[in-house]
């Protein structure tokens, strides 16, 4: 089943986002500008497109794995969230994680990928405690941040 996504091309000189391969989950987003990122620096990069995410769905902007592996280019707030009510240009908060080399992003480079997924819009219900609400007693409890074990050498 396919859902349509309305998209506005704000920069007619750029291609629309597209899938690299049939069946890929995400569509590639392109940089609308040239950007030089020094080591450890970040920049908010325009993509030249805006989308109308349908109600009950969310857009998630993920890094491109090849850029992360090859040159250390990633996204600061990964994944970036595009809520259904947002109608502005998609911008990507890129960061250069390479400790020594600058990264140059050129206009038209593929910089991120957009995935659109259904989301459950829950209603928050305040309870005084999980015990009283009958929601306590899991095997994990309040264990977090490393509670399931660490790396073999740590």
Curated annotation (Swiss-Prot):
InterPro entries: dUTPase, dUTPase-like, dUTPase-like_sf, dUTPase_trimeric. Pfam families: dUTPase. It catalyses: dUTP + H2O = dUMP + diphosphate + H(+). Keywords: Hydrolase, Magnesium, Metal-binding, Nucleotide metabolism. Its cofactor is Mg(2+). Substrate binds at residues 64-66, 77, 81-83, 91. Transmembrane segments: none annotated. SUPFAM superfamilies: dUTPase-like. One of its GO terms (molecular function) is magnesium ion binding. One of its GO terms (biological process) is dUTP catabolic process. Its EC number is 3.6.1.23. Pathway: Pyrimidine metabolism; dUMP biosynthesis; dUMP from dCTP (dUTP route): step 2/2. Each trimer binds three substrate molecules. The ligands are bound between subunits, and for each substrate molecule, residues from adjacent subunits contribute to the binding interactions. This enzyme is involved in nucleotide metabolism: it produces dUMP, the immediate precursor of thymidine nucleotides and it decreases the intracellular concentration of dUTP so that uracil cannot be incorporated into DNA. Homotrimer. Belongs to the dUTPase family. This is Deoxyuridine 5'-triphosphate nucleotidohydrolase. The gene is dut.
């Amino acid at each position: 089943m396919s859902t349509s996504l309305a998209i506005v091309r704000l920069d007619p000189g750029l291609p629309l986002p597209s899938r690299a391969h049939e069946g890929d989950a995400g569509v590639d987003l392109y940089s609308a500008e040239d950007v030089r990122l020094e080591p450890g620096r970040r920049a908010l990069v325009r993509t030249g497109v805006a989308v109308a995410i349908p109600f009950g769905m969310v857009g998630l902007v993920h890094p491109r794995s090849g850029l992360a592996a090859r040159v250390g280019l990633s996204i600061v707030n990964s994944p970036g969230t595009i809520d259904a009510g947002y109608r502005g240009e998609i911008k990507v908060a890129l960061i250069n994680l390479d400790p020594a080399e600058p990264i140059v992003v050129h206009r038209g480079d593929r910089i991120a990928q957009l995935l659109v997924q259904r989301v459950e819009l829950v209603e928050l219900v305040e309870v005084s405690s999980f015990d009283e609400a009958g929601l306590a007693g899991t095997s994990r409890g309040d264990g977090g941040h490393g509670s399931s074990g660490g790396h073999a050498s740590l």
